[in-house]
Amino acid sequence: TAAVREEVKLCPSVTKLYYADGQGKTDKAIADIKGMVAKGVNALVYFPDAGKAMLPALRAAYKAGVVTVPYRVTPGGTPGKDYTMFVGTDFQLAGKNWGEWIKKNVPAGGNILMLSGPAGNSQGTEERKGLEASLAGTDYKFIGANPFEATGWDPGKSQEVLTAAIAKYPKIDVIVSDFGPSLVSALDAAQKTG
């Protein structure tokens, strides 16, 4: 948020900046959006990590006249109808790049466990598509939930999910995570199990 505050200083038309953190809880994130609209904000830039579950709240903000810009993870819907515009990231490309790295560093193939944020988020779903495209026709196999094991990008939940996966799958060769801090905290569980 410090970087955002610095950027806002460069824009004289922004007179007040509010910040909210849904803390990985969809109901809190929805309440935060509603609260911002109730405060009378003119614009809302929002990371809808819960994906399509956020669309009704974003649509309501847009219909209330708030410039509404979700970014990175798509909430579904249509720009100009459900929100002002969407600023995206090419997550499939990220997944393809990870796949190339995996082929180079684990060339014999193996079992891949993928961790991502909340269930249904477009980031993890698109990254998985990119991974699958990159690894097609190879000896790699995805294990765990499809498209990924949901962690909510929460370090504690990531540790819980990884511990359960280690107990369930005796051989995990590659762990893919799209949120480093979450994975780092979970690696202690992996080390303890050998």
Give residue ranges: language-model regions.
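A residue-level marker of the well-folded mature domains of exported/periplasmic proteins
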Residues: T1-G194
